[in-house]
C-alpha cells in the first residue's frame, strides 16, 4: 500500500496518472537494461592494440603475397622473355639479403664473444669471405648509379655484361657453368708462365737435392703427370726463402700468380704482394678449419666451390674426384707453416694443371 501511494504521488507530480504496477515494471526494465549496457566487455571478444597491429600486418602480408603471385603469373603468361630475368633478379636480391643477415649475425657473435676470423667454423669463415667479395662487386655498381639517371645505364650494363658486373646470385644456372669455365680459362693462361718461372729458378737453388726435386717436378708437369703430395712437400724449403719465398717474388711472377688466383694484376708490386699474402693466408685458415670439420661433412656444392677456389675447375669433374683432390690439397696445406705459404700459392697450379678431367 505504501509503495502504491508513493507511485501515485510521483505520478501526480509529473502530471500523468500511471498505474503503479506498470511503473514498477518499467523501472525494473530500465535498471536491467542499464546493468546490461554498463557491464565491461569481455577481453576474449576484442583484441588488444598490439594484437590488432599484428593481425593487420599479417593481413597486409597475406594480401601482398597474393597480389605478388598474380603479378608473377601475369608476367609469365604475357611477357615470358622478361619474366625469366625478372625472376632471377628478384631471387638474387632475396639471397643477397639473406646472406647479409647471416653475415651480420656472424659478425655480432664475433664481437660479443671476442672471436677472431681464423677461430670461426669453416662454413662461417667461407660465408664471410664470399660475402665480402660480393659486397665489393655490388658497391662498384652502387657507385656507378650515383649520377642522375645513371641507374638506367647501369641496368643496361648489367644485362649486357652479367659476368663482369653481377654476382653469382643473379646468374642463370647455365650462366654459372659458362662463366666459371670462362674464369678458369683466364687463369689457365697464366699456368705456363708460372711453370716457366719455376724452371728458371732451378740454378738459383743452393741445395743440390732441392735442385733435382724441382727439375723432376717441372719435367712431370710438362709430361702431363699429376704430382704426388710428397713430390710437392719435398720442395717446401725452396718456397720459404730465396728464390721462391713470398718476399722474394718478382713483379711478373706476382702478376701471373694473381691471374691464377683470379685477382687483378693491375696494381703496384707492393699492393700485389700484400694482396697475395692476404688471400693465401685466408685460404690457409680456411684449410685448417675445413680439416677440423672434415671433407666428408661438406655437401656436393660446397666441395665443388672449395675446389674451384683453390684452382681446380670442378664444374665438369665428378664429386668423388673433387673430394679426393681436396683431400690432397688439405694434406699439403695443413703441413705448411706461415713462412711457407708461397708453396700454397703455387700449389694452385701444381696440383690442378694435370688432374684427371681438369683439362678443358
Curated annotation (Swiss-Prot):
Region Required and sufficient for mitochondrial import: start-end pairs: 1-110
In this UniProt entry, which residues form the Cytoplasmic topological domain(s)?
Answer: 1-137
Query: Which Pfam family, an example, fits this chain?
Result: LETM1_RBD
**Membrane topology reported for the UniProt record:** Single-pass membrane protein
Where's the Letm1 RBD domain?
186-360
Which GO molecular-function terms appear in the entry?
ribosome binding
Tell me which InterPro entries the record gives.
Answer: LETM1-like_RBD, LETM1/MDM38-like
Mitochondrial intermembrane side stretches: 159-360
Asked if Membrane is a keyword of the record, the answer is: yes
Broad class of where this protein is predominantly found: mitochondrion
Where it sits in the cell: the answer is:
Mitochondrion outer membrane; Nucleus; Mitochondrion inner membrane
**Is Nuclease tagged as a keyword?**
no
> Alphabetically, which GO biological process terms does the record hold?
mitochondrion organization
Q: Where are the transmembrane segments?
A: 138-158
Question: What does the annotation say about its assembly with partners?
Answer: Interacts with BRI3BP. Interacts (via C-terminal) with SMARCA4; the interaction regulates transcriptional expression of thermogenic genes in brown adipose tissue.
What's the stated role of this polypeptide? Plays an essential role for mitochondrial structure and function, as well as thermogenesis of brown adipocytes. In brown adipose tissue also localizes in the nucleus where it interacts with the chromatin remodeler SMARCA4 to regulate thermogenic genes expression, such as UCP1. May regulate phagocytosis and inflammatory responses to lipopolysaccharide in macrophages. Involved in tumorigenesis and may function as a negative regulator of the p53/TP53.
Write the protein's name.
Answer: LETM1 domain-containing protein 1
Q: Which gene encodes it?
A: LETMD1
Amino acid at each position: 500500500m505504501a509503495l502504491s501511494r508513493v507511485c501515485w504521488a510521483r505520478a501526480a507530480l509529473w502530471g500523468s496518472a500511471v498505474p503503479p504496477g506498470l511503473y514498477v515494471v518499467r523501472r525494473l526494465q530500465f535498471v536491467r537494461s542499464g546493468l546490461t549496457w554498463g557491464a565491461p566487455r569481455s577481453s576474449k571478444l576484442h583484441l588488444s592494440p598490439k594484437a590488432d597491429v599484428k593481425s593487420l600486418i599479417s593481413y597486409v602480408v597475406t594480401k601482398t603475397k597474393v597480389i605478388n603471385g598474380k603479378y608473377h603469373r601475369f608476367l609469365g603468361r604475357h611477357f615470358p622473355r622478361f619474366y625469366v630475368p625478372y625472376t632471377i633478379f628478384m631471387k638474387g636480391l632475396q639471397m643477397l639479403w639473406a646472406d647479409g643477415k647471416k653475415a651480420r649475425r656472424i659478425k655480432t657473435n664475433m664481437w660479443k664473444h671476442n672471436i677472431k676470423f681464423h677461430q670461426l667454423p669453416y662454413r662461417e669463415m667461407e660465408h664471410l669471405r664470399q660475402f665480402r667479395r660480393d659486397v665489393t662487386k655490388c658497391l662498384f655498381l652502387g657507385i656507378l648509379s650515383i649520377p642522375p639517371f645513371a641507374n638506367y645505364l647501369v641496368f643496361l650494363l648489367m644485362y649486357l655484361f652479367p659476368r663482369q658486373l653481377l654476382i653469382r646470385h643473379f646468374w642463370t644456372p647455365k650462366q654459372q657453368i659458362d662463366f666459371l669455365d670462362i674464369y678458369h680459362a683466364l687463369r689457365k693462361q697464366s699456368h705456363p708462365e708460372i711453370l716457366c718461372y719455376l724452371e728458371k729458378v732451378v740454378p738459383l737453388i743452393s741445395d743440390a737435392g732441392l735442385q733435382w726435386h724441382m727439375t723432376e717436378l717441372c719435367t712431370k708437369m710438362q709430361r702431363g703427370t699429376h704430382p704426388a703430395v710428397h713430390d710437392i712437400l719435398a720442395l717446401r724449403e725452396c718456397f720459404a726463402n730465396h728464390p721462391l719465398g713470398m718476399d722474394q717474388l718478382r713483379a711478373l711472377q706476382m702478376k701471373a700468380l694473381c691471374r691464377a688466383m683470379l685477382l687483378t694484376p693491375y696494381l703496384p708490386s707492393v699492393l700485389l704482394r700484400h694482396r697475395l699474402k692476404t688471400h693465401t693466408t685466408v685460404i690457409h685458415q680456411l684449410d685448417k678449419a675445413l680439416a677440423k670439420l672434415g671433407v666428408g661433412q661438406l655437401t656436393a656444392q660446397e666441395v665443388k666451390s672449395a675446389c674451384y677456389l683453390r684452382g681446380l675447375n670442378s664444374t665438369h669433374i665428378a664429386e668423388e674426384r673433387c673430394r679426393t683432390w681436396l683431400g690432397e690439397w688439405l694434406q699439403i696445406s695443413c703441413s705448411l707453416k706461415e713462412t711457407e705459404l708461397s708453396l700454397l700459392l703455387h700449389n694452385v697450379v701444381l696440383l690442378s694443371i694435370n688432374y684427371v678431367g681438369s683439362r678443358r
